[in-house]
């Protein structure tokens, strides 16, 4: 690994269809084998289904879903004197959003049958209503951090 200089962080451009940076991030995480147009179609179809079912703005629901699935704390392994402790640490905003999107996509893929757009729409609507596996994963992460609060002084 190079010790010279860290890679420059590229700005995330807003999605051309929805004019949202969050939508661009979601497309990138939905994409498989470099098929960006397919990922964009999946997100667009999912938003269409959300609009059909709720009648509200799908972009607002999407943002709410991501906010509800975003963890605030997580545990990280830290070795101290031969023992490994699960140390609770706060999650930076960018990392939290990335984790939420990753969970939303993975739990959408794990859902049964139907098209990916339908599975994604279902997971997003569940997350917006504080239900669904992505929100459950967030609660689980918070519980782990709470249980290991005693090791918080090992923070680095």
UniProtKB/Swiss-Prot annotation:
Keywords: Ribonucleoprotein, Ribosomal protein, RNA-binding, rRNA-binding, tRNA-binding. Belongs to the universal ribosomal protein uS7 family. GO terms for cellular component: small ribosomal subunit. The keyword Metal-binding does not apply. One of its GO terms (biological process) is translation. It comes from the Bacteria. GO terms for molecular function: rRNA binding; structural constituent of ribosome; tRNA binding. The lineage of its organism: Bacteria, Bacillati, Cyanobacteriota, Cyanophyceae, Synechococcales. One of the primary rRNA binding proteins, it binds directly to 16S rRNA where it nucleates assembly of the head domain of the 30S subunit. Is located at the subunit interface close to the decoding center, probably blocks exit of the E-site tRNA. The gene is rpsG. Part of the 30S ribosomal subunit. Contacts proteins S9 and S11. It comes from Synechococcus sp. (strain CC9605). HAMAP family: Ribosomal_uS7_B. It holds the Pfam family Ribosomal_S7. This is Small ribosomal subunit protein uS7. SUPFAM superfamilies: Ribosomal protein S7.
């Amino acid at each position: 690994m190079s010790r010279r200089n860290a890679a420059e962080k590229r700005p995330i451009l807003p999605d051309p269809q929805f004019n949202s940076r969050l939508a661009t991030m979601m497309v990138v995480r939905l994409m498989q084998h470099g098929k960006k147009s397919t990922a964009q179609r999946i997100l667009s179809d999912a938003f269409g289904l959300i609009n059909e079912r709720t009648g509200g703005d799908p972009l607002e629901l999407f943002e709410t879903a991501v906010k509800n699935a975003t963890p605030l704390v997580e545990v990280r392994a830290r070795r101290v004197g031969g023992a490994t402790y699960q140390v609770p640490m706060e999650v930076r905003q960018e990392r939290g959003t990335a984790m939420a999107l990753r969970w939303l996509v993975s739990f959408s893929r794990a859902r049964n049958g139907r098209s990916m757009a339908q599975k994604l729409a279902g997971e997003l609507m569940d997350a917006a209503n504080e239900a669904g596996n992505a929100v459950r994963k967030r609660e689980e992460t918070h519980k782990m951090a709470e249980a290991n609060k005693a090791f918080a002084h090992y923070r680095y």
